[in-house]
Swiss-Prot record:
Keyword entries, A-Z: DNA-directed RNA polymerase, Magnesium, Metal-binding, Nucleotidyltransferase, Transcription, Transferase, Zinc
Free-text remark on how the cofactor is bound: Binds 1 Mg(2+) ion per subunit.
Binding-site positions, Mg(2+): D535, D537, D539
Binding site for Zn(2+) 1: C60, C62, C75, C78
Protein family per UniProt: Belongs to the RNA polymerase beta' chain family.
Enzyme kind, highest EC tier: transferase
Recorded catalytic activity of this chain's protein: RNA(n) + a ribonucleoside 5'-triphosphate = RNA(n+1) + diphosphate
Protein name as catalogued: DNA-directed RNA polymerase subunit beta'
Listed SMART domains: RPOLA_N
Lineage, uppermost ranks: Bacteria, Bacillati, Actinomycetota, Actinomycetes, Micromonosporales
């Protein structure tokens, strides 16, 4: 087998019959599989050992040769080669067909490639292939022209002869009729008898006349058809074709079936065809030009490649290796077999029958029928169900053909090449491990022993506990006590990977140091649950063991959970104390007046703790404590900031008014962090962790998080927070409030009954009334709840729940929606604490069910979106440090605020400007340089820029990056998950796709009706994101001005027209069929600028691209996506969205090909287009003209240069058909293609830059070595290199560790 590391490209092409025979190890002649008695393969059958290799290692069929010493011998008795049985996975056979057949992919695919090549309609092609019509394959026009006069004379003579015989026959019959009539008259027959005889005679004469006329017409038709006979002409009348063949067989050839197609293809002159098509494109218009372009693509593909178009017609069919289509014996003696065996059997049966019929000299009609059946059998083998009804197996199930083996989620690409099951892995239920450190996980002993079995066995032998591997294995299986000690030693410092499905982003797989635990559940650190989105209600996780030293190093350095604290989407910490820990820290830092020990002063924190231990001081009592080693005091958001006493220096002792709890809280924070002297809730904690992440090393951050976790759990236990029925306090004035609003509602109902308002108005009024009522009851509840209430504590601290949920439990359920999503104007007045009535319960179930259904749909949709995003961006990798471009994009850093117009940091600066590279120097008003070009923008720099009064800066962006492949580090900016400059080799495309796809599930599904505009749908949430990335024309699209000008409105009967009168006096632009319901943004007489929206609605990005160009579209799409995510409170950095948009705008449509090889109308990569044009201009040629195109992500994925990647994405057969015809070569640049062929992916340390590192000793080191004495003088000689891979099985590398 070929070693995957020895090639850089993979080409796909059309296999000719010679190729297939070359691959084959023998012809399969019989449809038999295995003998039912001996269970051994039948000779020359589908499992024949002679063709495909032996079933048992080193053993021939008849048993003459057994053992490895006969390796390579071919048995003279049974003809089987003595070799390994695994060759049955790679050796192919073939079936020699008795008649040619066409390949269904090329004939039936859309568009039909055979049809384009031969210029035949698919309908006609089908008639020819399936023996319904004859086709003329060649005409000897010269001979026909030469002999036409003779032939016409012959036909004329025949016609005359026919006319003469007709005349003589009629004359004879007329004479007989006269004689008969005369005889009857003489006999005195009745008039009606005479009439009947006369009519009979005349009818016979008419028939003679008609017969002769038909004969003459047929001769005319034959001559006429012959005169006009052209190659590729169809003759559907069989009798006509036979007569043509019998009379003029030497002037033309023709036939039906695949043989005729083969003859047509052989007779084609591709060069002449291509030239004539190019001429048509130059001169033609409309449909003719479009068809010529499409045909030229196919013709040029065969001209420019080594492909022969004859590959589309098969003379022999390859048979894939038997172990890839196995036959397995089931219990009870029956066999389960792959569907392919049935399909091959059909082909072989029909082929053998056809051979026999041909040998017997059967009539043409029978042979043709058998040929058609053979064609259908081969079609079913290649792509069952593509044409006609699929071939079915038992239970009417369509059989899986070769195409089905590749297609879809269960196909070869997605099931076995992109996702494989791996060894050294296990899975189990997870439980919380509150005692673990951030970088640890608890691994069940039994599981660890199984996973690390080889390591344990080797170590047992090393330590002389076992003599050899075999006895070590026995020791492990019997679980001897010494085994556990060795296991403990082996797993120390050996990280394992934990993964929880679904792995939505890179934090779904992290590395941990395993700690052996009892039981069978994996223990997880509580802080990593957010990243895995794990909880302990029965979730399971998988464990994988990295084996090689490199894999272990990567796991430890890159994937360890303590190094994955920041979220790739926005660079914020994801490892946050949650729930119990927040309650604990809230309790710890809460301040309560009037508690024991309030107002006392302590000389040190130790003294205060002693007072607490003795029961003289309450944790939350305000006291004064003298603290040492402080760098400052943080008083929290909204409070007056702390001012240091005069003369105080950092580190000096200082007395602070605080609580003991806050002192204990600060002990968890790293030294050198300001003293936190305020109540800790979720938001404040998040800000602290954010701050720590920016200012302290990862080690300190991990230790702090562990400290916070410990403190949180400990004090949560101490706080004794519980919920009882008594804690759910109903608002005392609830009844009174509801009665008041009930009267209001009655008043509205009465007005409606009197006809004073419409049903719609009544509904609106009622909803408004009950919304007010609900809010008022909720307010009542807020005031009634005491601060000590545990529910209030949970909500106030941000640990769990919100006021809306509490309102439903304790106060009032409020208004609910029906299944359509409309609000029911009658509220549920009860709370869950009081209990709902039957009707209330019934109407409240609607919303709950819809919620569950929505969530299920959303999850599937979101997963599919992520898959498409990954596919489109998978080859965007950081390829170089800096592409050196001067291009950049302007971005807002600050925004004006208030009346004074002071400049503050822009609200979205964190997700737009942060983590980017400055493109220019930033100068303040006085001309001093505030920030230099190439600086990394962080929050400190942003503050400095805004303080200097600068509102907008130019930054580098992936949208303007000029790297040929992927993007460069400078244009990408800082890596968000690491907080450092991005490394060359980082797979930023996949990170971008994950960052956008992962929060997809949180986005709402619904497209809802806005209150103001009745019936106008606004797409929101996930469907809107899909609409943007698929570049679809949006629902409710708004027209935009093509040119600056004045607006004129014209109202029609049902719709209105907007007319823009351009400023430059050119023709007016009319936008018609605009609904009267749509709100206008430009009124009569207004002046509009180019690209301005004329009505309310969504802009069509394709229009925007046409009018304002790519930059406007990039800004628009980024803003639109961000709008959806921000509405749900999800933060995603712009750069992730920009990477996807860059991929969507990567192609250019060629309008005029100039002197280039590009065909007009084809999509070309922008970089290739520009470099080709530059080359032509430098050589004095005419450059091509093109137009940028916005492609949806699905289309962009399928248009990628890598056919492997596209085929594994969607429409597998179409992609492979196209790639084979164009003999596409995949240069294995992206990640998917390398995963598919089993190479190391070119990202991270797998990128060639890092793979080709050589260690060069310095000159001093060399001199030092050369000056060393005591080395024997030796000359090493090497034999000539073979250039082949060395089989690693033959070498002993000793220890792997």
């Amino acid at each position: 087998m070929l070693d995957v590391n020895f090639f850089d490209e993979l080409r796909i092409g059309l296999a000719t019959a010679d190729d297939i025979r070359q691959w084959s190890h023998g012809e399969v002649k019989k449809p038999e599989t295995i003998n039912y008695r001996t269970l051994k393969p039948e000779k020359d059958g589908l499992f024949c050992e002679k063709i495909f290799g032996p079933q048992r290692d080193w053993e021939c069929y008849c048993g003459k040769y057994k053992r490895v010493r006969f390796k390579g011998i071919i048995c003279e008795r049974c003809g089987v080669e003595v070799t390994r049985s695994k060759v049955r996975r790679e050796r192919m056979g073939h079936i020699e067909l008795a008649a040619s057949v066409t390949h269904i992919w090329y004939f039936k695919g859309v568009p039909s490639r055979l049809g384009y090549l031969l210029d035949l309609a698919p309908k006609d092609l089908e008639k020819i292939i399936y023996f319904a019509s004859y086709v003329v394959t060649s005409v000897d026009a010269e001979a026909r022209h030469r002999d036409l006069a003779t032939i016409e004379n012959e036909i004329l003579a025949e016609k005359r002869q026919s006319e003469n015989s007709r005349d003589s026959e009629i004359e004879k019959r007329a004479g007989k009729l006269e004689a008969d009539l005369a005889e009857l008259e003489a006999e005195g027959a009745k008039a009606d008898v005479r009439r009947k005889v006369k009519e009979g005679g005349e009818r016979e004469m008419r028939q003679i006349r008609d017969r002769a006329q038909r004969e003459i017409d047929r001769l005319d038709e034959v001559l006429d058809t012959f005169r006009k006979l052209e190659p590729k002409q169809l003759v559907t009348d069989e009798l006509l074709y036979r007569e043509l063949r019998d009379r003029f067989g030497e002037y033309f050839t023709g036939g039906m079936g695949a043989e005729a197609i083969k003859a047509l293809v052989q007779n084609m002159d591709l060069d002449a065809e291509a030239e004539s098509l190019r001429e048509t494109i130059r001169t033609g218009k409309g449909q003719r030009k479009i068809r010529a372009l499409k045909r030229l693509k196919v013709v040029a593909a065969f001209l420019n490649t080594r492909n022969s178009p004859l590959g589309m017609v098969l003379d022999c069919v390859p048979v894939i290796p038997p172990d890839l289509r196995p036959m397995v014996q089931l219990d009870g003696g029956r066999f389960a077999t792959s569907d392919l065996n049935d399909l091959y059997r059909r082909v072989i049966n029909r082929n053998n029958r056809l051979k026999r019929l041909i040998d017997l000299g059967a009539p043409e009609i029978i042979v043709n029928n058998e040929k058609r059946m053979l064609q259908e059998a081969v079609d079913a083998l290649f792509d069952n169900g593509r044409r006609g009804r699929p071939v079915t197996g038992p239970g009417n199930r369509p059989l899986k053909s070769l195409s089905d083996m590749l297609k879809g989620k269960q196909g070869r690409f997605r099931q076995n090449l992109l996702g494989k099951r791996v060894d050294y892995s296990g899975r189990s239920v997870i439980v919380v491990g509150p005692k673990l450190k951030l970088h640890q996980c608890g691994l069940p002993k039994q599981m660890a022993l199984e996973l690390f079995k080889p390591f344990v066995m080797k170590r047992l032998v090393d330590l002389n506990h076992a003599q050899n591997i075999k006895s070590a294995k026995r020791m492990v299986e019997r679980q001897r006590p010494v085994v556990w000690d060795v296991l403990e030693e082996v797993i120390g410092e050996h990280p394992v990977l934990l993964n929880r499905a679904p792995t939505l982003h890179r934090l779904g797989i992290q590395a941990f140091e395993p700690q052996l635990v009892e039981g069978k559940a994996i223990q997880i650190h509580p802080l990593v649950c957010t990243a895995f989105n794990a909880d302990f209600d029965g979730d399971q996780m998988a464990v994988h063991v990295p084996l090689s030293a490199e894999a272990q190093a990567e796991a430890r350095i890159l994937m360890l959970s303590s190094n994955n604290i920041l979220k790739p989407a926005d660079g914020k910490p994801v490892t946050m104390p949650t729930q119990d820990m927040i309650i604990g820290l809230y309790h710890l830092t809460h301040r309560t007046s009037g508690e024991r020990g309030e107002g006392r002063a302590f000389s040190s924190d130790a003294e205060a703790r002693m007072a607490f231990d003795n029961g003289e001081l309450h944790l939350q009592a305000p006291v004064k404590i003298r603290l040492r080693g402080l760098v400052g005091v943080e008083t929290g958001p909204g409070a007056e900031s702390w001012t240091a006493p005069e003369g105080w220096v950092e580190g000096d002792p200082i007395t602070v008014e605080t609580t003991l709890g806050r002192v204990l809280f600060n002990e968890a924070l790293p030294p050198g962090y300001r003293f936190v002297n305020y109540e800790i809730r979720k938001g404040q904690l998040s800000a602290i962790v954010n701050d720590l992440a920016e200012r302290f090393p990862k080690v300190a951050l991990a230790a702090t998080l562990d400290g916070l976790k410990e403190a949180g759990f400990h004090w949560a236990t101490w706080s004794g927070v519980t919920i009882g029925m008594e804690d759910v306090l109903a608002p005392p004035r609830k009844r009174e409030v509801l009665d008041r609003y009930e009267k209001e509602a009655d008043r509205i109902d009465k007005q409606y009954q009197r006809g004073l308002m419409t049903a719609e108005e009544r509904r609106g009024e009622l909803i408004e009334i009950w919304t007010k009522a609900t809010n008022e009851v909720a307010k009542e509840m807020d005031t009634a709840l005491p601060q000590e209430n545990p529910l209030w504590k949970m909500i106030n601290s941000g640990a769990r729940g919100n006021l809306l949920q509490l309102r439903q439990i304790a106060a009032i359920r409020g208004l609910v929606a029906n299944p359509k999503g409309e609000i029911i104007p009658r509220p549920i007045k009860a709370s869950y604490r009081e209990g709902l009535s039957v009707l209330e319960y019934f109407i409240s179930t609607h919303g709950a069910r819809k919620g569950l259904a929505d969530t299920a749909l959303r999850t599937a949709d979101s997963g599919y979106l992520t898959r498409r995003l990954v596919d489109v961006s998978q080859d965007v990798i950081i390829r170089e440090e800096d592409c050196g471009t001067d291009r950049a994009i302007p971005m807002q850093v600050g925004q004006q605020t208030g009346e004074a117009g002071s400049l503050v940091v822009h609200e979205h600066a964190e997700t737009s400007v942060h983590a980017r590279t400055l493109a220019d120097d930033i100068k303040g008003p006085d001309g001093t340089v505030v920030a230099e070009r190439g600086a990394d923008i962080n929050s400190i720099l942003v503050d400095r820029i805004v303080a200097a009064g600068v509102e907008s800066v130019r930054v580098r962006s992936v949208l303007t990056c000029e790297s040929k492949l992927g993007v460069c580090g400078a244009c990408y900016g800082r890596s968000l998950p690491t907080g450092k400059t991005v490394d060359v080799g980082e797979a930023v495309g996949i990170i971008a796709a994950q960052s956008i796809g992962e929060p997809g599930t949180q986005l709402t599904m619904r497209t809802f009706h806005t209150g103001g505009v009745a019936g106008e749908d606004i797409t929101q949430g996930l469907p809107r994101v899909q609409e943007i990335f698929e570049a679809r024309i949006p629902k409710g699209k708004a027209p935009i001005a093509d040119t600056p000008g004045r607006v004129r409105l014209e109202d029609g009967e049902r719709s209105r027209k907007i007319i823009v009168v351009p400023d430059d006096g050119s023709d007016e632009i009319v936008y018609d069929k605009i609904s009267k319901r749509v709100r206008l943004l430009a009124n009569d007489g207004d002046h509009v600028e180019v690209g301005e929206k004329l009505t309310v609605g969504t802009i069509d990005p394709h229009e925007l691209l046409r009018i304002l160009g790519p930059r406007a579209v990039q800004v628009h799409l980024t803003q639109e996506v961000q709008e959806v995510y921000r509405s749900q409170g999800v933060l995603i950095h712009d750069k992730h969205i920009e990477i996807i948009i860059r991929q969507m705008l990567k192609r250019v449509t060629v309008i005029d090909s100039g002197s280039t090889e590009f065909l007009p109308g084809v999509l070309v990569d922008r970089a290739l287009f520009e470099s080709e044009n530059r080359r032509l201009v430098s050589e004095g040629g005419e450059p091509a003209a093109g137009r940028p195109v916005l492609m949806g992500i699905t289309k962009a994925s399928l248009a990628t240069d890598s056919w492997l990647s596209a085929a594994s994405f969607q429409e597998t057969t179409r992609v492979l058909t196209d790639a084979a015809i164009h003999a596409r070569s995949d240069s294995l640049i992206g990640l998917k293609e390398n995963v598919i062929i089993g190479k190391l992916i070119p990202a991270g340390t797998g990128i060639s830059k890092y793979r080709n590192v050589r260690v060069e000793p310095t000159e001093e080191a060399k001199a030092k070595v050369y000056s060393m004495t005591g080395y024997p003088e030796t000359d090493y000689g090497f034999g000539p290199a073979s250039g082949q891979a060395v089989p690693l099985d033959d070498f002993d590398f000793g220890s792997y560790r």
